Every structure is written in C-alpha cells, then in structure tokens.
C-alpha cells in the first residue's frame, strides 16, 4: 500500500491538497457448512481526493470542501444461498469492481466569540462498475446442473441480472446536518445552548444480485 499527498498553500489561511492512496481488506473464509464460497480473496481500493481548507473573514468563517473517488476491486459483499438440504447461509463474496465518487462540504461560522453556527453536506454515488453473471461469484456460465452447488435463493433469471451501474447497498446518496451552539458565561462556569438537525437519505438493503 502507498500514499502520495501534495499540498499547496497560496496564503496562510488556505490549503489545497491532492492525495492518492491504496489499501486493502484481508480475505477470509465463510463459516457456513453449506456455503458455496468457502473462501474469498482480499479487497483492494485506490482512492483519489482533491480538497480545500480555508479560513476567511478574520478567521470567523471556515470552509472545508473535498471531492473524491474510490475504485474497488473484489469488493466484499454478502450473499444468501440455500443448500440442497434446505439450509440457508449468508456468505461473503467478492464482487469484481465498484466505484464510489462524491463530494463533501463543511461550513463553520462564528458571528460572535461565544456563538458558532455550522453545517455539512455530502453526496455519494456508489455503484458496481463491472458485470457479474454468476451468483456463485464466478463470471461465466452458471453451473445449473452441478449437484454439489447450493441452490440460490434467487431464480436463474435473477442470478443473470447484470449489476453494472447498480447502486451499492447501505450507502446513502445524500447526508446533511446543521447546528448552532451558544455559550453563556455564568458565575463559576458556562452554559451551552445547542440545537442540531440532521438528515440521511434512504438506503438500499437488498443484495446486488
């Protein structure tokens, strides 16, 4: 794994940065006795990020923004299968490739020394970017006549459904929040008045295939 980072500061209060990072998540094995996937390989990711951090208006306004892209190979996902004996097991498999891209924005404003107003917003577009035609984790012909392969909970037609461009599970497309914190000094200490609000977009829970 490696990380390359380039920083540029046009002023004392502003920073631009560009980074490229690689990483991986180790593979493993599935514990289900009737699992169609005894083992799965490691997951690899390459991330690209361009961002800005800056303070303005006599350091009363702070703006942080970034745009990013993650490219996954053999990304880990869950898949449910049914054995020829009728048992159901949940296994981890590696989907060939996926891509996540989006941007984040954070703004913090201090109208008075004891009053802070802030908010953030993020947008994420996470999709599978390569086909998989075999629910058993293999690209190619489904082994319909293999008596040793557990039967899928999905039909053969559903197992052949392409996933290129399908949204990834459990990743909200939009998230945002806002808050206001006012600090009142009193004898012997202080009192904070905090009000916050947050919202998260709907997510997909079902399997990709």
List each language-model region with its residue ranges.
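Extracytoplasmic loops and strand-loop junctions of Gram-negative outer membrane beta-barrel proteins
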Residues: 1, 31-36, 85-92, 157-166, ...
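Transmembrane beta-barrel architecture of outer membranes
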Residues: 1-3, 35-37, 45-49, 175
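Membrane-embedded beta-barrel scaffold of Gram-negative outer-membrane proteins
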Residues: 9, 15-25, 41-116, 120-122, ...
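Gram-negative outer-membrane beta-barrel transporters
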Residues: 69-71, 93-207
